[in-house]
């Protein structure tokens, strides 16, 4: 055996012995959240910018009274007769059901029969979070606001407060591991703009698998 070959084999043996030792591998310093973008100095403006870029329509308003007026304005603009309305502490406090009925609209709850859900012209809901980085709406599944509320009507109107904005998706996953009752959500929906598909002849089509229009009314207070 030549000296060169013997030296090579000895180095291989040493490397194998070192590799088998616990803790012999070099530790890599943590690099934090790679790709974290955040929201900059104005999370609300950042969200509206990104949401609009994704094809949504943002409507910043000063208070809840103006938010209600904006919902009625949009419903009137779409000539929507049947409204699918979510529920929850935030939405219920707005008194939208009564205002919509006074405007002559038929209002259904999310637990309505299947045929009723498909007949809705507009879906109105709250949100759990808004992600400034991507302009996304986040919904945690619950009986009062199921997926059908934001999926079936051709137009979706979401009402939110600026306090629900989080900077980045990394922040969302830190927050959404459990619900208030201590259990993880059965489903998490992250919606960025209206429904889009481009798998037919490579042409972008909107509104095939969900709402063709999505509006966010963002309350400053």
Report residues per predicted region.
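The feature marks the mature, well-folded catalytic cores of soluble enzymes
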Residues: 1-221
């Amino acid at each position: 055996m030549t000296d060169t070959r013997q030296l090579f084999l000895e180095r291989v043996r040493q490397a194998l012995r070192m590799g088998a030792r616990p803790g012999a591998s070099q530790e890599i310093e943590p690099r934090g959240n790679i790709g974290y973008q955040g929201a900059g100095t104005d999370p609300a403006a950042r969200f509206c910018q990104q949401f609009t870029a994704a094809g949504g329509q943002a409507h910043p308003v000063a208070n809840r009274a103006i938010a209600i007026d904006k919902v009625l304005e949009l419903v009137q603009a779409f000539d929507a007769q049947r409204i699918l309305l979510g529920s929850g502490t935030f939405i219920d406090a707005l008194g939208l059901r009564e205002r919509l009925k006074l405007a002559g609209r038929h209002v259904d709850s999310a637990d309505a029969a299947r045929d009723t859900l498909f007949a809705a012209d507009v879906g109105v809901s709250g949100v759990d979070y808004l992600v400034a980085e991507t302009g996304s709406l986040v919904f945690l599944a619950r009986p009062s606001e199921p997926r059908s509320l934001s999926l079936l009507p051709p137009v979706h109107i979401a009402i939110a407060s600026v306090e629900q904005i989080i900077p980045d998706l990394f922040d969302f996953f830190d927050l959404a591991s459990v619900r208030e009752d201590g259990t993880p959500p059965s489903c998490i929906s992250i919606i960025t703009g209206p429904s889009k598909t481009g798998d037919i002849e490579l042409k972008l089509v909107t509104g095939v698998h969900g709402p063709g229009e999505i509006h966010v009314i963002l309350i400053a207070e």
